Amino acid sequence: MNSAHPCCDPVTCKPKRGEHCISGPCCRNCKFLSPGTICKKARGDDMNDYCTGISSDCPRNRIKK
């Protein structure tokens, strides 16, 4: 990760104080996206996947039953 990233502490390259995340499908402008924000659209047998609001990662694929 580039230490010049605006969300990144230049010494530790962890999120700066008051910021939640540096990157990821559920991270924008150093903050987690709101719960329910689509991070991966449905395709084939998959269903939409949604951000949780507490992580920068997109949850694992949900499959239609």
UniProtKB/Swiss-Prot annotation:
- Indicate the principal place this protein occupies in or around the cell: secreted
A GO cellular component annotated for this chain's UniProt record is:
extracellular region
Where is each Disintegrin domain found? Answer: 1-65
Q: Which domain of life is it from?
A: Eukaryota
Tissue distribution is:
Expressed by the venom gland.
Please report a single Pfam family linked to this protein: Disintegrin
Q: Which GO terms describe its molecular function?
A: toxin activity
Q: Where in the cell is it found?
A: Secreted
Instruction: Describe the family membership recorded for this protein in Swiss-Prot or TrEMBL.
Output: Belongs to the disintegrin family. Dimeric disintegrin subfamily.
Quaternary form?
Heterodimer with CC8B; disulfide-linked.
Report what the protein is called: Disintegrin CC8A
Where does this protein come from, organism-wise? Cerastes cerastes
